[in-house]
């Protein structure tokens, strides 16, 4: 990214589950807003994803421990409202 200090302009909460919400849930579990912030902080160009589903497979937290995720959905319906959606 050209601008390494991208800040979100607005935030909203997820209302229903989707594949995008699933991936945001995984990034936020690992301590990041979204894929943009993860790539900025970890200085990586690609995120490990499951080829079958496209969901995030593995993330490295800020303390350098790893989170590993399943191929299937992990964000239950009761967790969806906790997911934050950032607009840039």
From Swiss-Prot:
Q: What's the name of its gene?
A: MEIG1
Native organism is: Bos taurus (Bovine)
A Gene Ontology term for the protein's cellular component? nucleus
Can you cite a GO biological process for this protein?
A: spermatogenesis
How does this chain assemble? Interacts with PACRG.
Similarity section: Belongs to the MEIG1 family.
| PANTHER family per UniProt | MEIOSIS EXPRESSED GENE 1 PROTEIN HOMOLOG, MEIOSIS-EXPRESSED GENE 1 PROTEIN
Xref: InterPro entries: Meiosis-expressed_gene_1 (IPR020186)
Q: What is this protein called?
A: Meiosis expressed gene 1 protein homolog
Q: Which UniProt keywords apply?
A: Differentiation, Spermatogenesis
Q: Does the keyword Chaperone apply?
A: no
Described purpose of this protein according to its UniProt entry: Essential for spermiogenesis.
């Amino acid at each position: 990214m050209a601008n390494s200090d991208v800040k979100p302009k607005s935030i909203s909460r997820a209302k229903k589950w989707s594949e995008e919400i699933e991936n945001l849930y995984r990034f936020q579990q690992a301590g990041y807003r979204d894929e943009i912030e993860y790539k900025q902080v970890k200085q990586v160009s690609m995120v490990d994803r499951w080829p079958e589903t496209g969901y995030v497979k593995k993330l490295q937290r800020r303390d350098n421990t790893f989170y590993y995720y399943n191929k299937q959905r992990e964000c239950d319906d009761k967790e969806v409202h906790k997911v934050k959606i950032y607009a840039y």
